[in-house]
Amino acid sequence: METTFGATGLGVSRLGLGCGGIGEARVTEGDAERLVHAALDLGITFFDVARSYGAAEERLGRALGARRGSVVISTKGGYGATGCDDWTGACITRGIDEALGRLRTDHVDVFHLHSCPPDVLLRGELHDALLRARQAGKIRVAAYSGDNDALAWAASCETFGSVQCSINVFDQHALRDSVPRAASRSMGVVAKRPLGNAPWRFHERPGADDVAAAWDRMRAMSLDPEPLAWEELALRFTAFAPGVSSAVVGTTRIEHLAAAARAIGEGPLPSDLTARVRSAFEAVGAGWPGLV
């Protein structure tokens, strides 16, 4: 399951753990630790968190403990730093220092600007702060997490060594241009939402906007996942899409994570099935933007 993370020098697992769930109050400290340890035992070495994920950074840092050196930690920020205005150079600098404390580490492997719009992404002070942090050894890779126009710009920006974006059966927008562009520059690419919010769970259009959008696309595409189950089709399509380094699954259930690991362990989809998925999207979704 191990692959290279672009030209960054990092090695990552094809399957990553999205740690947003372990930051929620409903999840106990013990459950968070068991999930992280189960991920490690499954061979997962890529862990993705963010400043906005509740207590996730603190819990991940505690759970990793002495095994920190065997994993790649990806976090996200640009906001919420003590005593700083959001999306300023000072916020980036202070935010990285605070993340290091929460994660109990002396460096973050990948630090993303978290979904800021294009006009914010252009601010030179943000790039200067990232470069200083990298030169100081506090981060190894400066990155951007987001979609659409901002992603396209970031994929061409010299500051960034990786990007994170939405990629799944129902959201292939980034595969048209931004991901190939990033891959051509040997950037790492993290795919978020590889299950596309799993709209196949519903017999009727769901009420939540993000799931409803995926459900609408699923219906429009009229794609039959056979001979596979939807979950396996979705995970293998995303994890092995050209240019993708790691597909991040967000869950708090060990059995779901283990099932995802088994699916990705099956390797890439057959080429004819991949072509069918791409064709079903392009036939109706040529104008669909990335789902934010």
PLM region descriptions:
Residues 58-77, 128-137:
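Alpha-helix-loop-beta-strand connector modules within alpha/beta enzyme cores
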Residues 115-292:
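Beta/alpha (TIM)-barrel catalytic core signal, keyed to glycine-rich beta->alpha loops juxtaposed to Asp/Glu
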Residues 5, 17, 47, 60, ...:
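Conserved, mostly hydrophobic/aromatic
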Residues 26-39, 87-103, 146-154, 230-235:
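Short, acidic/polar
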Residues 100-119:
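Active-site groove signature of glycoside hydrolases
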Residues 24-28, 50-58, 80-85, 118-122, ...:
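Acidic-and-aromatic substrate-binding clefts and catalytic sites of carbohydrate-active enzymes
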Residues 1-71:
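N-terminal binding-site loop/beta-alpha segment at the start of enzyme catalytic domains
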Residues 18-30, 77-93, 224-225:
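Active-site mouth loops of central-metabolism enzymes
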